[in-house]
Amino acid sequence: MPKRPAENPEQSDDFVSKSQKKREMAERQELGTQLVNLTDSQLAKMPLDDELRDAVLLARKIRNKHEGYRRQLQFIGKLMRLRDIAPIEQALNNLKNAHQQQTSIFHEIETTRDKLLHEGDDALQEFIEEHPHADRQKLRQLIRLAEKQRAEQKPPVAARQLFVYLRELLG
């Protein structure tokens, strides 16, 4: 007859299956892998204690030693089981969101530049109304130069300069 968890309700609340424990360990080990793959500046922003930070740095050093690296990742997972990982997960999510925000801003600037280049004075007037601090003369000059370079099939230097100027204004 197979063993069952205790019928006592007090004990059944604390019961966690072996499979659930393994899933949690794998999640924490994956979180450790994400920490190892961060850049130095990103890792410096993580709320890690010294022991965990040292373990992550060691894993980076032995990355090309397959078995040692695997065991180090397991050790990082073990260290993380003993700690509250919510702040670490939050910091990683903030890093991911910051990248997504930068990407969306980049796309918005590209769209604005393309609109200014293709729709002419109406788009420029609309942009100036939305951003009164923008230099109308500089924008007109860059747009004219970009159109000229496109007509002459030259590299789009002015379009890049327009992008940089828009990034300064919007970013």
Curated annotation (Swiss-Prot):
Q: Which GO terms describe its molecular function?
A: ribosome binding; rRNA binding
Q: Which UniProt keywords apply?
A: Cytoplasm, Ribosome biogenesis, RNA-binding, rRNA-binding
Chain residue ranges for the region called Disordered: 1-30
Q: Which InterPro entries match?
A: DarP, DarP_sf
The reply to whether Hydrolase figures as a keyword in the UniProt entry is: no
What's one Pfam family the UniProt record gives for this protein?
A: DarP
Cross-referenced SUPFAM superfamilies, in alphabetical order? PSPTO4464-like
- The source's domain of life comes to Bacteria
Annotated coiled-coil segments of the chain: none
Any single GO CC term annotated in Swiss-Prot or TrEMBL for this entry: cytosol
Which BP terms does GO give this entry? Answer: assembly of large subunit precursor of preribosome
For this protein, the record's Gene3D superfamilies field holds: PSPTO4464-like domains
Q: Which family does it belong to?
A: Belongs to the DarP family.
Q: Quote the HAMAP family the UniProt record gives.
A: DarP
NCBIfam families (UniProt xref): PRK05255.1-1
Q: What does this protein do?
A: Member of a network of 50S ribosomal subunit biogenesis factors which assembles along the 30S-50S interface, preventing incorrect 23S rRNA structures from forming. Promotes peptidyl transferase center (PTC) maturation.
The protein's name is: Dual-action ribosomal maturation protein DarP
Taxonomic lineage of this organism? Bacteria, Pseudomonadati, Pseudomonadota, Gammaproteobacteria, Alteromonadales
State the gene name recorded for this protein.
darP
